[in-house]
């Protein structure tokens, strides 16, 4: 009986060691107080650089969006009701041949206008970009790469890409991609977004 109990305790200790090892590994990506203080100070500095938190790391906002978009293999879907020229500029280096759909109702001040969109398309003719309405039901913003494929990825975005880094915000990858399928399927049926002149 003692031998069985000793074996069970031994097994429990091995399991506990594994859990502690996993926690220690996860702590490598945790932001320290000093890193967070540096980030907060950058939001109130006169520096032009825009910063955000990306998967618990302090990063340049523009670089984060461009890095995410460059990973796409077949499609990029951006859901963001507050769009502007900066939203488009983040997409300029997307891989050639990737279909990009921007889902938006284009609300708020500083809306994207047709002239800006037309000029962008002329300057970056290899960017395959179209727009659809969101239908007034979205608050959150997110990016979906390679929808409906084995490579599908979803990123939740705290702020609109046109304002990213202006205030404290973050982008995180959500690994539960299947829950977004009905949302994206609905969005794909929405009408084309017509931009104001």
Residue ranges and their predicted role:
Residues 68-73:
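Secondary-structure "cap/kink" motif recognition
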Residues 1-62, 83-197:
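PLD/PLD-like phosphodiesterase catalytic module centered on the HKD motif
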Residues 76:
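Catalytic histidine site
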């Amino acid at each position: 009986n003692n031998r069985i109990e000793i074996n069970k305790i031994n097994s429990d200790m091995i399991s506990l060691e594994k859990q502690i090892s996993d926690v220690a590994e996860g702590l490598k990506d945790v932001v320290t107080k000093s890193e967070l203080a540096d980030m907060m100070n950058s939001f109130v500095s006169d520096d032009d650089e825009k910063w955000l938190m990306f998967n618990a790391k302090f990063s340049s906002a523009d670089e984060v969006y461009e890095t995410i978009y460059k990973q796409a293999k077949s499609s990029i879907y951006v859901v963001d009701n507050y769009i502007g020229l900066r939203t488009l500029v983040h997409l300029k280096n997307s891989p050639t041949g990737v279909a990009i759909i921007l889902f938006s109702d284009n609300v708020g001040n500083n809306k994207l206008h047709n002239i800006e969109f037309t000029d962008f398309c002329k300057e970056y003719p290899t960017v395959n970009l179209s727009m659809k309405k969101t239908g007034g039901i979205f608050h959150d913003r997110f990016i979906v790469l390679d929808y409906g494929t084995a490579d599908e990825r979803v990123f939740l975005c705290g702020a609109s890409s046109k304002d990213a880094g202006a205030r404290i915000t973050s982008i995180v990858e959500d690994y539960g991609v299947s829950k977004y399928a009905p949302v994206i399927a609905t969005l794909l049926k929405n009408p084309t977004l017509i931009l104001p002149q």
